[in-house]
Amino acid sequence: MTRTLLALLAALLVLDPAAALAQRQYIDVGSPDFRPLAIAVVPFQSGPGAQADAVDVQLTFRDDLSLTGIFDLLDPRSFLADASEGTQASTIKFRRWSDVGAEGLVKATVKREGALVAGELHLYDVRAGREVLYRVYRERTARALAHRFADDVLQYYTREPGVFRTRIAAIRKTQGAWDIVLLDADGKGAETLRRETAIALLPTWRPDGGEILFTSYRSGKPEIWALRVPDGTPRPVVSLGDLASGGVYSPDGRRIAFTASVDGNSDVYVAGADGSGIRRLTADPATDTSPTWSPDGRRIAFVSSRSGNPHIYVMNADGSEQRRLTFQGNYNQTPRWSPRGDQIAFTARDERRVFDVFLISPETGKIARVTQDQGLTNEEPSWAANGRLLVFVTDRGGRQQLVISNPVGDKQRVVTSDPAGLVAPSWGPLPP
């Protein structure tokens, strides 16, 4: 019976080559055979009064796909087919799109519906000659619509959620103030969540996106506070000893790990999300700081100088089985565990005293370099929610700005040009 069923399935694939071709549309980004998928984005059509919106949606959509590093966006000047051929698969000349190398084809129409920007997205599998995705959305802005489209296309091809509707928190130092700002995932659309007149550092997101922890000096010493999103309402969380800083939520949002200095010694602590039930995890005479949770909440990576210089260590979430992870470099800091669990991103200073971003496997200790010869400082990495992109700080343009990069480091882009500069990025969770 099993052999008969397998034979029938094989026969169906032979009889329906489109189905077989469609199977190859899945992009396995982690595969050694990975190559970018060639995709044609036809100039978006517009309804009355929506011409500017259509242009904005198209440009943002293309920019989003380009940032992922997994698409090869074809030059519209190479297109052979008539852009007005319609959206019905039966009217599309797929052979002409195939002749220019397209594997995927995107068409869209953008309209105005009162205060909303509405859009229809069509995605086609060129080799199979059929439509594979159709979406209709209404959003408040053209950029929001574009991010929605990009997330859907990314999820179709990778079978993983897109991240372009997420936000990035960062710190902007202005004259006499520190702004906690929120940006879109492409580095644009910055808005100030809260302005602090005291030093504000190290924002990190709650897993549901409803709150951001940060380190505040409003009392004169470092304390951990939280800001409600989206209105920026603050609340105190932890004040302990000489300092409490660098708070990070556990993956379930019920606990926070942080650094505190009691009696002059910095160690890693945990507490409830409301600051209660504080418990010390490390008790080494050296400095222990910068905790980051594994995605399953069972382990914590942190920085310790117990070996003489700052290195990355890993321990169980209860503080047991502390072990050194990095043995290369003499100044390793700011670890951030990937949501996929397989890598920890961190900053390291090399032999030229240049700071760069690296990755290390928490299981094998194998190290990979993300940045090199791209300015004097690349630091403070933070992962996108799908673990496929990183944001970090660079000085390669003179002033500190944010870079989006794939983990391999061969696709990088400076995505901000803030006059005051931006530091301490934290990439937020997927929207509900």
How should these model regions be labeled?
Residues 28-93, 106-112:
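Short beta-strand->alpha-helix linker/helix-N-cap micro-motif
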Residues 25, 87-152:
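Amphipathic beta-strand/beta-sheet edge segments enriched in Tyr/Trp
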Residues 184-201, 227-245, 271-289, 315-331, ...:
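Multi-bladed beta-propeller domains
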Residues 162-164, 207-208, 251-252, 295-296, ...:
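Residue-level detector of Asp-centered blade-edge/turn motifs that repeat once per structural unit
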Residues 116-118, 176-181, 221-225, 265-269, ...:
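Structural motif
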Residues 168, 212-213, 253-257, 297-301, ...:
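Hydrophobic beta-strand positions that form the internal "hydrophobic ladder"
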